[in-house]
């Protein structure tokens, strides 16, 4: 972009004319830019010569100075143009202002010497005056020239030849080579530092991208694993709910058949079967021998044990029923003690349990009434018996029998005479008096 001289044209032109005019005291004018723009403004003027001008130059700016000096040889006025670029100016600004030098030279016309300066050593007044003296073209002064007539006889003309000093020449050349090499080394060092910095920056950028990619892959993998776990838990929960809602008789796997296959796989020489024989009521035989005119026995009131407070597990959802074993329950639940010794021995042999440690029915001291199912509203006569309940358990959930080999019960019902025939299935009496199998995880044993 070109330099703008029209914005402050009047001030610029006035200072320039004052320097050209020998009648004015102003012998130098200094120009610079307005901020970072290309508009030229008048920075300062003065009448103190080069010494005063040098003090006004700033190391952080690009400036143009026009100064009037006297030729040391002829005493005539000479004009010097100084293109000043401070050491603190940025490289981009230097490149932009380099194109303005020719424009400023056309504006500040009449300069005998032009100096491009960057440091204070380039604008020392002595060095500038030496350049002005060399530019005059003659080493004489018109005002100091003496008349030839007054001169005395001239002596022989002496030679101006000077012998070359080899050492000084070597030192001068060596110094120049040294500084040139130093500048070259410094330039190479800066270039190497830039390459190293760029390489380190690229390496850090690659590591950052690789780390971010690994972290993203890890997060994605954890998310997929978590999603799979959630889906598996949801499917398992749905299967559990579906199995709980389907009755035992309608399930795809029949637990009785599974247990039957398991029981068949056992060796035949195992313990005595836990299946009891058919029960026969001795009370019927006894009543058949008695005459019809015998008075009916007095009714006996049943004394029921108050139910214990129910014990519920942490979750009220009934667990799945385990595989039941195949078993045949007895046909009757009444065991009467006979007064006859022979009959008593016979009944004890019939009701002996298949297992050695547990009896299905133990001896009782009184008889129970077998006429409880009479449809008429007549009083029910029962034979007073003493029943031993054996191992008891309280129902935690309700269970409906799938067939006649199982028993049904409601929560808090008491189940007595329990036999542990399998790990998942037990056998006992329900409150209704039925004997059969039931799932072990539906009840809680009572101490």
UniProtKB/Swiss-Prot annotation:
Domain SH3: 388-447
Polar residues: compositionally biased ranges: 246-255
Chain segments annotated as coiled-coil in the UniProt record: 180-245
Compartment list: Cytoplasm, Cytoskeleton; Cell projection, Lamellipodium; Cell projection, Ruffle; Cytoplasm, Cell cortex
Membrane topology of the entry: Peripheral membrane protein
Keyword Cell membrane attributed: yes
Comp. bias regions, Pro residues: 319-328
GO terms for cellular component: actin filament; anchoring junction; clathrin-coated vesicle membrane; cortical actin cytoskeleton; cytosol; dendrite; early endosome; Golgi membrane
Positions of region (Disordered): 141-160, 184-368
Domain ADF-H: 2-133
Keywords for this protein: Actin-binding, Cell junction, Cell membrane, Cell projection, Coiled coil, Cytoplasm, Cytoplasmic vesicle, Cytoskeleton, Endosome, Golgi apparatus, Membrane, SH3 domain, Synapse, Transport
Entry-linked CDD domains: ADF_drebrin_like, SH3_Abp1_eu
GO biological process: neuron projection morphogenesis; positive regulation of axon extension; positive regulation of dendritic spine morphogenesis; postsynaptic actin cytoskeleton organization; regulation of actin filament polymerization
Family indicated by similarity: Belongs to the ABP1 family.
Name under which the protein is recorded: Drebrin-like protein A
The species this protein was found in: Xenopus laevis (African clawed frog)
